[in-house]
Amino acid sequence: MRIGIFTDTYRPQVNGVVSSITTLERELRKKGHKVYIITTTDPDAPAVEPNVLRIPSMEFKPLPQYRLGLLYSSRIIKKIKKLNLDIIHSQTEWGVGTFARFAAINLEIPLVHTYHTLYEYYTHYITRGHFTVPAKKLAAAISRFYCEKCDALIVPTRKVEDILYSYDVDKVMNIIPTGLDLDRFYRKNYTEEEIKFMRESFGIEENEFLCVYIGRIAQEKSIDVLIDMFSKIKDKTFKFMIVGRGPITEDLKKQAEDLGIADRVIFAGEVPHDKVPVYYQMGDVFLNASISETQGLTFVEAMAAETPVNARYDLNLEDLLVKNEAGLVYRNEEEFVNNIMLLKKDKEFRNNIVKNAFNVSQDYTAEKFGERVEAVYKKTIEEYDINESFTIFRGEKYIQQIRRWTSIKSSGRSPWSK
């Protein structure tokens, strides 16, 4: 197959969506498919990128790490047409996602969409605390509109499926969790001496119990909740390491100082991608309090690393942790603390959790991810009916309007530049 993946975010950016796309791209190419990436321009992108087509874009001010691409460019459409795509796979509901829909209509190509992000948990970046309820309703409306107008819909977890149904999305959904390169997280890759050396480099003694959080340092991750609950553990042999970077780092440092635990909370900062696995190995337990995750890939990484997970209860953890006794969940401060104490005191219990978690993680391999998405592509192409697809896009009149609009040539690139 000749596959076009449309996304607002791609390398050199680093985030969960980019990781998912990179993994999918590689697995599809292993299977002999031709994969093209259609994404936004980026000032840090390489000058030459085989099979990558970049759409003029500009910085999105509320979230500077993201870029907003043109909704349409006749020049880019002509280039896409020459690719002779069999399927278009959009990874966003916004700029490039809209472009993907226009391309699917104009070029009569089936459209598959993956819904990655629960926007209702991120509206604070735009509203700054104002109009929160209307913003969440708008996010739901946009999600519903886009998801219903594709030929096939992929979601990563049952939680996302349930939320989209609550948005009144009337569409059959394919639940396909993102796959990961798990090999690099396995404990067998690291010696006890290497792990001990890394712990000592941060002042962690052999008898100390290290809790770790790895991820973006942002409001929706609820790291402040973790720090507050961790402060209830008065035993000074317990320490908490926060790995990552983000806009609220300084606020969290102040919180730790105010709680009198600054000497037990370690801010490791951002670490190179290839060094992340050893930080899981350093930890005695992986902590998380976020309920904004669509699937929680860091949970799977910790499970593959044989580091037990203690996470705030959320629906997406039912299949991942609860059902298979592959990790611990808490609903309040008391359960949070009790879980940590249990993992420290009961070695047999901890070993059973770790064993179950490792086995569950094997269902999240990159290879299985590629196979599942490939199957959706094949089914969508087989069942594709151009007339029915046009109906999905709200009828012939709507199609004619889009085609008239998209026949207008792009008037220029500024400020949509690299």
Regions inferred by a protein language model and the residue ranges of each:
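Nucleotide-activated donor-binding/catalytic signature segment of Leloir-type glycosyltransferases, i.e.
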Residues: 251-271
